[in-house]
Amino acid sequence: MGRAPCCEKVGIKRGRWTAEEDQILSNYIQSNGEGSWRSLPKNAGLKRCGKSCRLRWINYLRSDLKRGNITPEEEELVVKLHSTLGNRWSLIAGHLPGRTDNEIKNYWNSHLSRKLHNFIRKPSISQDVSAVIMTNASSAPPPPQAKRRLGRTSRSAMKPKIHRTKTRKTKKTSAPPEPNADVAGADKEALMVESSGAEAELGRPCDYYGDDCNKNLMSINGDNGVLTFDDDIIDLLLDESDPGHLYTNTTCGGDGELHNIRDSEGARGFSDTWNQGNLDCLLQSCPSVESFLNYDHQVNDASTDEFIDWDCVWQEGSDNNLWHEKENPDSMVSWLLDGDDEATIGNSNCENFGEPLDHDDESALVAWLLS
């Protein structure tokens, strides 16, 4: 494909032209004209390429060529034409008679482009140059427009370009809520009330280290008419005259005497007034064991046995403490089996309740349990 070569490359002479070749080319063109540059070398008898013959004739052998250096007037005209026409050297050479396009191009690249900033414009010549440019521009044919390739247009060319400014969204920082002093104070008071109520419900255990039972003044539920730690619940069972009534507000003196105050509402029964808190008070307070056993013989009630504080009975006797007698395990078992011997069981004050046992007592108890 492509353009056909101007001549056959076989046997073509290359290099500088000789004077004989210049003379043959000049004589042939003067007699026959330029004609076709492809057939000219063959017709003239030259072993040269047609392009080489054309360039040799146009640039060197023509009779109308202007020899010598380019004048300042020509330089100014070249500058003006170049500013309007650009690098169209053939059009610029058409406005300069006797100058070729190749000569003007070489002179521009080697001289004018370097000293363009030092070039001085003369008013007399500028008027002539402007007139020449206007006449030549009107007579010159319009330049051919570049052909545009047919095809689909891109989406970027079809869509209108709209520049949108992006607005930054500012995050709203919520300030931390101020603490409400009233609410905090109310919550604190509520917690204090709850804690005090819990402590009131738990209560204090009886003091087993010599203090009198009258010192325990805290009630279980904090209500009037309900059994408290001061109440001697065992006295409810020790009343021989009327065992069916209940006695509240019963206190025990320091010498073991019982002072009972009859309650008018005491005949209601154990199921109505007895609760778990009163049972704990019964087990914690240590009444007279002898009086309790006497009442047990008089009143055979099945519910009485569950209120006996057997820990107090085990730990203390009438005169001698069973845990400190250092007897054999058989004697301890015999004492436990002889429950009718009331003489061996005396009044107890629970002074040693909760105290750790001696090493001998612990070993004796373990031996009895393992036997």
From Swiss-Prot:
Disruption phenotype: Reduced flavonols levels in roots. The double mutant myb12 myb111 and triple mutant myb11 myb12 myb111 accumulate less flavonols in roots, leaves, stems, inflorescence, and siliques. The double mutant myb11 myb12 is specifically altered in flavonols content of siliques and roots. The triple mutant myb11 myb12 myb111 is impaired in flavonols biosynthesis and exhibits a reduced UV-B tolerance.
Stretches with biased composition (Basic residues): 146-172
Assigned keywords, A-Z: Activator, DNA-binding, Flavonoid biosynthesis, Nucleus, Repeat, Transcription, Transcription regulation
MF (Gene Ontology): DNA-binding transcription factor activity; transcription cis-regulatory region binding
Ranges annotated as DNA-binding: 37-61, 89-112
Biotech / industrial applications: Promotes flavonoid biosynthesis when expressed in tobacco (Nicotiana tabacum) and tomato (Solanum lycopersicum) through up-regulation of the biosynthetic genes. Tobacco plants exhibit increased insect (Spodoptera litura and Helicoverpa armigera) resistance due to enhanced accumulation of rutin.
GO biological process, one term: response to salt stress
Disordered: annotated span: 136-183
PROSITE patterns registered for this protein in UniProt: HTH_MYB (PS51294)
SMART domains tied to this protein: SANT
Pfam family, one: Myb_DNA-binding
Record flagged with keyword Zinc: no
Location of the protein in the cell: Nucleus
Main subcellular location of this protein, as a coarse class: nucleus
Annotated function: Flavonol-specific transcription activator involved in the regulation of several genes of flavonoid biosynthesis. Activates the expression of CHS, CHI, F3H and FLS1. Controls flavonol biosynthesis mainly in the root. Confers tolerance to UV-B.
PANTHER family named among the record's database cross-references: TRANSCRIPTION FACTOR MYB11-RELATED (PTHR47999:SF111), TRANSCRIPTION FACTOR MYB8-RELATED-RELATED (PTHR47999)
Name this polypeptide is given: Transcription factor MYB12
Taxonomic lineage: Eukaryota, Viridiplantae, Streptophyta, Embryophyta, Tracheophyta
